[in-house]
Amino acid sequence: MVLIIEIIKIGQIGPIGQRGQSGQRGQSGQRGQSGQIGQSGQSGQSGQSGQSGQIGQIGQIGQIGQIGQIGQIGQIGQARRTGRTGRTVHRRMLQASSSFNISPDISICRRATRNMGEEERPLGC
């Protein structure tokens, strides 16, 4: 009888082991999640602004230099305006062609000299 009572008393000491639950304080290690601040490294994506280098493609605007071919229109005007001799037509067309490095247009030459005889037409017409 005496032994049983002592065993029961010793068993009551067991609940003191609940103090071991204070080990939950170890969960404060979650503070280590503050390492997520390292995600601010995503700001490195601002390097995409480097794509602004595509502006260099604007250099294709240099193709506008083809507008210089509009000088051919000048040949048409000069050929039509001259109603004089075929030599005048020929000279004016050669002036236009030499300044733009292009050959005289035969059809323009023929139209401008259609009222002339074969002898009066300049060479190439």
Swiss-Prot record:
One Pfam short name: Collagen
Effect of deleting the gene: Impairs the formation of the hypoxia-typic morphotype, increases surface adherence and reduces the hypoxia fitness.
Gene Ontology CC terms, in alphabetical order: extracellular region
G-Q-I/R/S repeats: 11-13, 14-16, 17-19, 20-22, 23-25, 26-28, 29-31, 32-34, 35-37, 38-40, 41-43, 44-46, 47-49, 50-52, 53-55, 56-58, 59-61, 62-64, 65-67, 68-70, 71-73, 74-76, 77-79
Induction pattern: Expression is regulated by the hypoxia responsive morphology factor A (hrmA).
Region 23 X 3 AA approximate tandem repeats of G-Q-I/R/S, annotated ranges: 11-79
Keywords annotated in UniProt: Cell adhesion, Repeat, Secreted, Virulence
Disordered: annotated span: 15-57
Presence of keyword Ubl conjugation: no
Membrane found in the keyword field: no
Predominant location: secreted
Residue ranges of the TM segments: none
One GO BP annotation of this record: cell adhesion
Subcellular location: Secreted
Domain notes: Contains a tripeptide G-Q-I/S/R repeated region and lacks a canonical secretion signal.
Function: Hypoxia responsive morphology factor that modulates the expression of the subtelomeric hrmA-associated cluster (HAC) containing genes that alter the hyphal surface (such as reduced total chitin or increased beta-glucan exposure) and perturb inter-hyphal interactions within the developing biofilms, resulting in a loss of vertically aligned polarized growing filaments.
Name the record gives this protein: Subtelomeric hrmA-associated cluster protein cgnA
Native source species: Aspergillus fumigatus (strain CBS 144.89 / FGSC A1163 / CEA10) (Neosartorya fumigata)
